[in-house]
Amino acid sequence: MNTPIGSRYPAFLRHTHWITFVLVLLAYITINARKFLERGSAERLFAVESHFLLGMLVLLITVPRIVVRLRHAAPPIVPEPGVASRLAAWTAHLALFVFLVVQPVLGIASRLLSGRGIGLPLTEWAIPSVGAAQPELAESLEHLHEFVGEAFYYVIGIHILAALWHWLGRRDNALQRML
C-alpha cells in the first residue's frame, strides 16, 4: 500500500527519524569517546557497552520505521525538484536505511561471533554468544563495521547538507516535511 498523506510525514516517521538521529549521534560519540578512556576502566566499558545498546536500539527502531515508510508515499516537495535531484535523494535515503540496518547487524554479529557476548551498560547482564567463537570472522566483520561507520560520516554529512540546501538554497519544503 502506498497511501498519500499531507504535506508532512506521519508523526511516527518524524519522531523515529529524530530519535534515530540522536541514537546514531550518541553511538558515534560513545565509540569515539572510548579512544580517550583508559583500557580496562569502568568508563571505557560504559562507553563501549553504551555503543552496543545504542546500535541495537537503532536497529529496533529502524525496522518498524521502514515498514511504516513503505506504506506511505513521501509528501511532495514543493516546488518539485528535477529528476536528477529526486534520483540522488532516493539513492541517499536508500543508503541511509541500509546503513541503519546493516551497521548494527555487523556490530552485533562481530561481537557475538567473537565469543564475548554483548554487555549491557550499568548492569551485569549480557547477551551471550551462541555457538563456538569464530574470531577470524568476528574480526573481519568488526573491520567492515568500522569501515562502514567511517564511510557514513560522509553520507550523513551529505544528508544534512542536502536538507540545509533545500531549506536555505531552494527554499522548498523538503526539510519541513520531517519537522
Q: How does the language model describe each region?
A:
Residues 1-179:
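Membrane-embedded alpha-helical bundles that constitute the cytochrome b-like, heme-associated redox core
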